[in-house]
Swiss-Prot record:
Domain notes: The N-terminal domain determines nucleotide recognition and specific binding, while the C-terminal domain determines the specific binding to the target protein.
Subcellular localization: Cytoplasm
HAMAP family for this protein: MobA
SUPFAM superfamilies: Nucleotide-diphospho-sugar transferases
Signal peptide start-end: none
Annotated gene: mobA
Cofactor: Mg(2+)
Protein name: Molybdenum cofactor guanylyltransferase
GO cellular component assignments: cytoplasm
Keyword Cell division: no
């Protein structure tokens, strides 16, 4: 099975004072580098969605793209709508979507999603559930469903949760919430 990753690094990072969150340092290393190190062994290709510092991100993956102009500033759905027209991503069997600010992702993330997807072959979308919360921004989806994000966004809807519900996505349970800690502020980075 061919699984690609899409790392979302296109947020406005308002809680970081506008600093590019993916390039913020944790232990002397950019957050996105931590994420890449966690997902690279699990996937065959990595794409990055970003709206700034494109050259810097291109050093990490040659497959980068900004949000299409008509979808900018709509959060993660902007990246999904833009990715819907990416021919290279369309060749994957599955797409792992993760944010750039979760440096502790588990090493068995794709394997766990794969196991559940084999038991429920008619389901096209999954997301992470922990004892504390649902992580809708960590998805394992069939690239073909990305097209449905476009009319969803044009209809005025903007949440990943509702879009995933529309796709009849299923949660995949992970017991350790610490793997999914998102570092949103400078204080988070200092404590990280």
């Amino acid at each position: 099975m061919k699984t690609f990753a899409l790392i979302l690094a296109d947020g406005q990072a308002s809680r970081m004072g506008g600093e590019d969150k993916g390039l913020a340092l944790l232990g002397g290393k950019a957050l996105i580098d931590h994420v890449i190190d966690r997902v690279r062994p699990q996937v065959s290709h990595i794409a990055i969605s970003t709206n700034r510092n494109l050259e810097e991100y291109a050093r990490r993956s040659p497959h980068i793209f900004p949000d299409a102009r008509q979808w900018q500033h709509f959060g993660p759905l902007s990246a999904l709508c833009t990715a819907a027209n990416d021919l290279q991503l369309a060749t994957a069997d599955w797409l792992l979507v993760v944010p750039c600010d979760m440096p502790y992702l588990p090493g068995d993330l794709v394997a766990r999603f794969e196991t559940v997807s084999k038991r429920t072959p008619l389901c096209n979308a999954y997301y992470v559930e922990t004892p504390i919360t649902m992580h809708y921004n960590i998805m394992y989806i069939r690239p073909q469903i990305l097209q449905s994000a476009i009319p969803y966004l044009f209809s005025g809807m903007k949440t990943l949760r509702s879009w995933l519900q529309q796709q009849r996505a299923r949660p995949v349970r992970f017991e350790f919430d610490g793997h999914f800690a998102d570092l949103n502020t400078q204080i988070d980075l200092q404590e990280g």
